[in-house]
Amino acid sequence: MKSLRSMFAEPLSAYLDLRRALGCRCEEPTFHLRSFDAYACQRNHTGPLTQELALAFALSNPKNSTNYCARRYQVVRHFAEYLAIYDPTTPLLDPKILPHSQARTPRHIYTDEELLRIFDEARSLSPKNPVRGLTFHAMIGLAASSGLRIGEVVGLDRGDVDLKTGMLLIRQSKFGKSRLVPLHSTTLDFLRKYAAVRDASFPDCKEAAFFIHSGQRRYARNTLQRVFVGLAFRAGLRGPKGRGPTFHDLRHRFAVKCLVTWYKAGIDVQGMLPALATYMGHVHYTDTAYYLTATAELLALAAERYQNWLDQGEVVS
């Protein structure tokens, strides 16, 4: 990797090549290890990768959050484990320094009424360019009804969307996996409507992307996120400053909606988690549990099921 310049450049490059060969995602480690390489150069560091160097790098920017610093440290620590195999002078770094907090920001589970308000705001975007509002409506609706990640939405190509069978092909997503995602009938109908308007508006467009802007190019994920935040603000769901509901919260809504549906139908929710994990593109179904936020509706349904269980004469031990 030509941009690496520290004394660790060669093993860093070999380490990242190994991760890629093993099928591991490398975007975040590459980013942090490039920064580590630059930091080591800045300090004119020579000698082994020490605990002090790794910790100083992790804490080098006082503006970073505690969790972000912890992540930087852990990435370097894993590299040090690799380095120790070839360089016995490399110490094993303490895994308990800068522990990553397990606390997560509570997610916002959009109600149907809140989603409708966002859709209304989307349709009012750019009155002189109605395709723009329809496009954002379609992208947001697809994420809400199918649980797609924001990168998966903007990454869809026309060939990935089968408007006849209602099937999406999600290619090489977050964990390097591809999967098929069946669409709800109402979502399919809306995507057909969008595709018809798009093709009529841009009949000579050669762009492969399914969702395009007026420049006849694919939307960037940052653009979709930024516009969505603005729509949520105008819909009264966010304040002018600070954190509020995000596009990714649509994915949480989808998972919770699935859970509520299964509870109401009397289906074994635990037994369905592997299927939901596959649908959402998780490697392990335990990752899916993060999305199953305890909403008031879920708690009420769980309490009702538990009461029915007691009424049937089961014994609690």
Regions found by a protein language model. Name each.
Residues 1-317:
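Conserved catalytic core of the tyrosine transesterase superfamily
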